[in-house]
Amino acid sequence: MTKKKILVLSDHPLSPSGVGTQTKYMIEALLKTGRYQFICLGGAVKHENYTPQKVDPWGDDFRIFPVDGYGNHEIIRSVLQKERPDALWFMTDPRFYGWLWEIENEVRANLPMVYYHVWDNFPPPKFNADFYNSNDVVACISKVTHEILKTVAPEVESHYLPHAVNETY
């Protein structure tokens, strides 16, 4: 069986941020199925160490490349060409991904863009419509977000997919 390769853009999955921990929980749950591999651009304002990591016990199936911010056009183009991922999954506030949506036609010609998103208050942010419409799927972390998506960008496929929870804690 060939594993699906997912390119992930988010906070560094081993960081203690909410975005980082949610990303890690999602990745680990999918790795346990044996059907996926993850190449992560682990975002931060600045890293102390930019050495790529293979996360134990997953090895080549869970690789992290530390990046400043969440990446840029050149990094995405390079990763798409070298790694040939099957999907792009990304998470954090939309204001950090304007650069990505600038090249969404380029990206979406090769693989679907899945945005894991939360916007927790009304009124619906109509100013985000272009961002929402630049994805193949928006996975909504809250029911409020899902209602907002159905209002602001009804033509975009969206699903309610709440935060992951580590059952150990």
List the model feature ranges, each with a label.
Residues M1-K54, E83:
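N-terminal subdomain of nucleotide-sugar transferases
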Residues L41, V67, L161:
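Hydrophobic residues at beta-strand termini and immediately following loops
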Residues E48-I75:
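Conserved nucleotide-sugar phosphate-binding/catalytic loop shared by glycosyltransferases and other
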Residues R77-Y97, P112-Y115:
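Short N-terminal targeting/anchoring amphipathic segment
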Residues F90, C140-I141:
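Short beta-strand scaffold positions
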Residues R108, P125-V137:
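A conserved, positively charged/aromatic
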Residues N110-P112, V137, E157:
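Proline-centered loop/turn at the N-terminus of a beta-strand
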Residues V144, A164:
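Carbohydrate-associated surface elements
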